[in-house]
């Protein structure tokens, strides 16, 4: 079946139930950004494969909302589907609640699978449509009725992340989170977020490709904890270790009756942005709900010193692999056939040679030429093209190691470049260097820092339609919150102060449709710079250690400060990576990291 047929089948089920609009999100039951194959309902119905987007199906039409990272990709993948692309954030594009208000009749029904819609999203829809007495029909997953060959729920084995990697023991983390629960006046904390559960219990799994989490919910009380999980995924040894820390097991789907059975007078902590609508609707009468951001988010984001040191180790391993890849690509292009997919496989194989490599941290975004303008382009058998000894290769990739999670982008000159290509690369790199060198007072947020990265592009009347930075988990998701670097306060759901120990990306870019794309990305860790009578100053330490491409630079556009920053960074790269290279690779690294003279 194709998207047109899939939508027709869904509309037939909607008509049987008198449903006027059906909402299909990207999320799983845990509001995850990246989901297992079972949960790719929006992709099944629309054909759009991006990691962010919401589909609304009406009886005679459909629309899909996505953000600026995916405008070009979505326009291509939705072509011929009959689905209208809604470019989020652009003038005249309605938000989904307003669209539903305008397109669902009085006393109508909006359908969705209430296990996949966050409580906050359902609340915003409900508030907007209430004046028309529109009701929800959220008890049935209609997509499941029409997706006849739907993959089963993943159930991969759990494994333990030792404290020598994680820093805190499971018991220490449970104690710290219980302290937060008490501070918030709650008796029970319902935790649906997969990354938060994995972090808290020092467990990892394999139920989401590239993200080592496992399908589960956790009920944390003052004296006990209940992990709702597929028991087949838990070994007897891990079950015993959990029991020793006061964590009992229950079936995965028991979360709803467990929440419903909480006695009157119980105060339940729930994060309405992370909890699905069915969980919140399961809370019984007389039970008080405390809807607050999960305290685990910030605890997880502020990396333990042991995690930070492990991340440095992981990034040296990763830096060696990516540096060797760039050397191979530059010295092989034009001599042997190389395509986007073959280059991606080469990069993965080089990483796999490293110690403690577990997997990639996301599907590689490896593009050549015009494909680079598709921000999250991923090569497929159908889209794969050969690379030629000119223009840019944009390589955005990452890995999971026992020591941490990596994410790096390098835009690589494969030969001759146009003046425009060099100009854009240089402007992007200048912004990247400026943000990387930031020194700022504690209290700044990502909105404060973002302009440092965009300033060179803004001065030229240019911009990129994505955030400059996102948090990164520790052997977890390559995207995590609560920190985010983006200037537009209207896009921020929650404003987060940048704290010591946070790890986030520094990745400005620029994309010219039909021509090329440029992005340069390092991960950085926030460290204390100094404290004096003016306050506590923080700075950013680069974790990523891979050379920039001097072949892509227009040196006339660099300031003396730019050159100083680049030279300092390249000195760090050479010191960290050179001990692991030899022969021609080492000689090349020495050459490409040698100091540049200004002027």
Where are these regions (language model features)?
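Active-site neighborhoods and metal-handling regions in enzymes and metal-associated proteins
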Residues: 1-599
